[in-house]
Amino acid sequence: MRLSRYFLPILKENPKEAEIVSHRLMLRSGMIRQQSAGIYSWLPIGLKVLNKVCDIIREEQNRAGANEILMPTIQSADLWRESGRYDAYGKEMLRIQDRQERDMLFGPTNEEMVTDIFRSYVRSYKDLPLNLYHIQWKFRDEVRPRFGVMRSREFLMKDAYSFDLDYEGAKMAYYRMFVSYLRTFARVGLQAIPMRADTGPIGGDLSHEFIILAETGESQVFCDKAYLDLAVPGADTDFRNDAQLTDIVNRWTTPYAATDEMHDEADWSKVKPEDQVSARGIEVGHIFHFGTKYSEPMGAKVQGPDGKEHLVSMGSYGIGPSRLVAAAIEAFHDDAGIIWPKAIAPFGAGIVNMKPGDEGCDAVSEKIYEALTNAGVDPLLDDTDDRPGAKFATMDLIGLPTQVIVGPRGVAAGEVEIKDRKTGERQSLSVEAAINLLTAEA
């Protein structure tokens, strides 16, 4: 993409309404625009990042055996009355009526609808286990939306829902999602720590929040330093191997980890002082087993191997892709702007033509741009007439992993400069060496 043709509305000043780093940088870098309280438009560069996050989530859900569907944003109130949640949910639910005066709602979540889909088609235990997921916009009418897309009223969510014959089956479905989430966050470039969460009236221990450590985190968290060195399950993980999954979950739940709500001083005191990590954290995912909470009132049953009908045991598994984008910025930024992990960077590299109109600079910039494009690197070429200082500031702000600086002096010497956005390190290379370096990992 050429910057001269790209819609990138950069803000030079920090927006007054932005309270946290991610909100400020997302507005300044032209990723989002606020349309009303807690509601945002995603602009081209922001949407590219959001789509990359969704692609990774989708790949890992599919790898774990989940099936993608797409449920509507507008739901019938009748389904929610079946579960008993329509009147109990509160003012966060946006209730509406159609022209026939039928009660509808803008879905804040999808347990009722996915249970209705399941009960309409599945009759036998032979069709289990089953996991259905979708990535869809949600709306919750927060009293005080704040922090940009971190806590907005409209947000994108990946919801997965598992259906199993019994608790043992549901536990393995939970383990599959647990391991899938570890891989998902690692691929995005984040180190997420699973922390035991409240299970409410359901009880048991199958509820975890996935937390990333960040100075601007919304909650206090406590964990054993051992988590920082745990190896994330590899691409060769067999999601059909219950023993392997159980071993992974055990390794990732044995050391101490808790949010302030679940913190236990007695257990915490058993962790060596030098291994105690007390920090701020951001929740980026939540998985939860809720048994027959929805299958019972909605009659979601299957015939078991004993010939009798059984209520299915269910779980839900959520990741907010829009929130995850903001969380990544909170984790990876400096005073100059965003520092994107390579996997979700909007462009693979930025090419800075220091002097558009100069025959040599134009030729070298075009050569690199064409080579990177053909190799699938997806570069952004700054071919604008902005001053060099403004060009560098823009590249640092939008956080592309690598910058290729093409200037008259370097071109005369047959070289370009490569800058690593994360480390700030610079190196001068021949044009061919620069192309080889940037295309080696494509």
From Swiss-Prot:
GO biological process: prolyl-tRNA aminoacylation
GO cellular component: cytosol
Record bears the keyword Ligase: yes
InterPro entries with a match to the protein in the record: aa-tRNA-synt_IIb, aa-tRNA-synth_II, aa-tRNA-synth_II/BPL/LPL, Anticodon-bd, Anticodon-bd_dom_sf, Pro-tRNA-ligase_IIa, Pro-tRNA-synth_IIa_bac-type, Pro-tRNA_synthetase
Keyword presence, Protein biosynthesis: yes
The reaction(s) this protein catalyses: tRNA(Pro) + L-proline + ATP = L-prolyl-tRNA(Pro) + AMP + diphosphate
GO molecular function, one term: ATP binding
Primary subcellular site in the record, as a coarse category: cytoplasm
Complex formation: Homodimer.
Function: Catalyzes the attachment of proline to tRNA(Pro) in a two-step reaction: proline is first activated by ATP to form Pro-AMP and then transferred to the acceptor end of tRNA(Pro).
Assigned protein family: Belongs to the class-II aminoacyl-tRNA synthetase family. ProS type 2 subfamily.
Protein name per the record: Proline--tRNA ligase
Gene assigned in the entry: proS
